[in-house]
């Protein structure tokens, strides 16, 4: 599909990673951005005007790169508002792990589609997903037209190094919208032999490694009792970070941990809503930022958030950082927006869709500026971070295809069917229990 956006404000990111806004046209040919500039011709020397399947008057709207949800567990939609108000480890052991064992057949497929629908309404065009039954998850991505990077939730109870390697090869060859990076659930759920196996696979495939890292204070204390090292230091000793990667949450960090992240060029993914809801702590974002460490933002799963909304995550990311450091000027709004877009793309190794530029994949969002919360237009970047909302998302395009527009989904599924299937799954698993 070839699409022309005209009369558009366009958020662009230059080679020095500075945002600016132009008023131009943007052309999409197939899955790629082929022109950004004035006029109508993609090539000013061309004899003929390009042929477009769709021409969209974007007056009063802002085109931005799609948000990258850099940490999530998408199919956990079935546990949204089911088990809440518990600390992390009690929540996992009493509610999450037992109910996950009851997922059967194609449950994960349908639950993943529900999550993808929510992503699209929030302008999220790709996710970095860790969950079980990954062939069902990735099938949902392929069938809806979404973009997903998977990593493994390998632990003492689920999967094996052999399954991890099988999925790594399968997903990386499946589609240009799917990829796989090595990982495991967490140090506290994964024994030494499995950790060593992951390190060997990282060396074999020259792959980054990802995991939950320093999410709670007790996690770090227990790891130090077992190994005499923090989770970050343990993974460094095992050789997991030879080819990059990083950690999700990264709250309870020590000075040496920051040094490892800096020296290995790792990424820290912050998940503010989940960390607040589970009372895990506040990520020391400013320490990462001041050390030049790449940062990204994730929603975490819909059972611990419970919302998949990048606008909310951006506001909480900046707000919590300011309060933690007692510094209202600590991290500027454009840096937060970078984390939610290009920073996430870098973490996920999908740099071909990190920004709106010629030659990049057409993963973009059209933001409605003619809403009270986006006026006046003093600073549109700050509006996105401080006052933006998913109500402003008018259109979401992934890989050149419009998957969501004006409240309607174009993913090949009836939303009512997805809602019905999702409710049926949790009713079956819970025995019709509902926490009212």
Q: Whereabouts are the PLM-identified features?
A:
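Active-site microenvironment of metallo-dependent hydrolases
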Residues: 1-24, 29, 45-48, 340-436
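Active-site gating loops and adjacent loop-to-helix segments of metal-dependent hydrolytic enzymes
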Residues: 78-110, 144-152, 170-172, 217-244, ...
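Alpha-helical scaffold segments that flank or form the walls of functional sites
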Residues: 80-145, 165-174, 422-431
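Metal-coordinating catalytic core of metallo-dependent amide/deamination hydrolases
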Residues: 136-254
């Amino acid at each position: 599909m070839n699409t022309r956006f005209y009369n558009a404000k366009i958020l662009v990111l230059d080679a020095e990673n500075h945002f600016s806004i132009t008023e131009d046209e943007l052309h999409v040919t197939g899955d790629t951005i082929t022109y950004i500039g004035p006029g109508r011709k993609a090539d000013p020397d061309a004899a003929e005007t390009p042929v477009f399947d769709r021409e969209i008057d974007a007056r009063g709207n802002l085109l931005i790169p799609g948000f990258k949800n850099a940490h999530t567990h998408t199919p956990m939609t079935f546990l949204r508002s089911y088990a809440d108000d518990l600390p992390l480890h009690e929540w996992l052991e009493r509610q999450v792990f037992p109910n996950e064992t009851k997922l059967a057949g194609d449950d994960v497929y349908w639950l993943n589609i529900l999550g993808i629908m929510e992503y699209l309404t929030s302008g999220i065009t790709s996710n970095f997903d860790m969950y079980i039954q990954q062939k069902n998850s990735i099938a949902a991505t392929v069938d809806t037209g979404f973009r997903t990077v998977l990593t493994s939730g390998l632990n003492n109870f689920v999967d094996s190094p052999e399954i991890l390697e099988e999925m790594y090869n399968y997903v990386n060859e499946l589609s240009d919208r799917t990829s796989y990076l090595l990982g495991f659930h967490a140090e506290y759920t994964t024994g030494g032999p499995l950790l060593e196996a992951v390190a060997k696979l990282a060396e074999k495939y020259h792959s980054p490694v990802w995991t939950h890292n320093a999410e709670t204070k007790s996690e770090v204390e227990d790891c130090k009792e077992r190994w005499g090292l923090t989770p970050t230091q343990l993974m460094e000793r095992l050789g997991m970070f030879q080819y990059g990667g990083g950690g999700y949450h990264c709250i309870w960090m020590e000075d040496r941990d920051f040094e490892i992240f800096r020296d290995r060029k790792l990424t820290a993914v912050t998940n503010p809503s989940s960390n607040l809801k589970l009372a895990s702590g506040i990520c020391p974002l400013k320490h990462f930022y001041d050390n030049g460490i790449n940062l990204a933002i994730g929603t975490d799963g819909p059972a611990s958030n419970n919302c998949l909304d990048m606008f909310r995550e951006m506001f909480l990311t900046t707000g919590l950082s300011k309060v933690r450091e007692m510094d209202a000027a600590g991290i500027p709004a454009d840096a937060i927006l970078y984390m939610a877009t290009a920073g996430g793309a870098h973490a996920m190794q999908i740099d071909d869709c990190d920004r709106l530029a010629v030659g990049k994949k057409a993963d973009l969002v059209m933001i409605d500026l003619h809403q009270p919360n986006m006026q006046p237009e003093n600073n549109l970047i700050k509006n996105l971070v401080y006052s933006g909302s998913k109500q402003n998302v008018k259109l979401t395009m992934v890989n050149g295809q419009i998957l969501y527009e004006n409240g309607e989904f174009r993913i090949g599924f009836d939303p009512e069917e997805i809602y019905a299937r999702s409710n049926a799954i949790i009713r079956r698993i819970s025995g019709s229990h509902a926490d009212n």
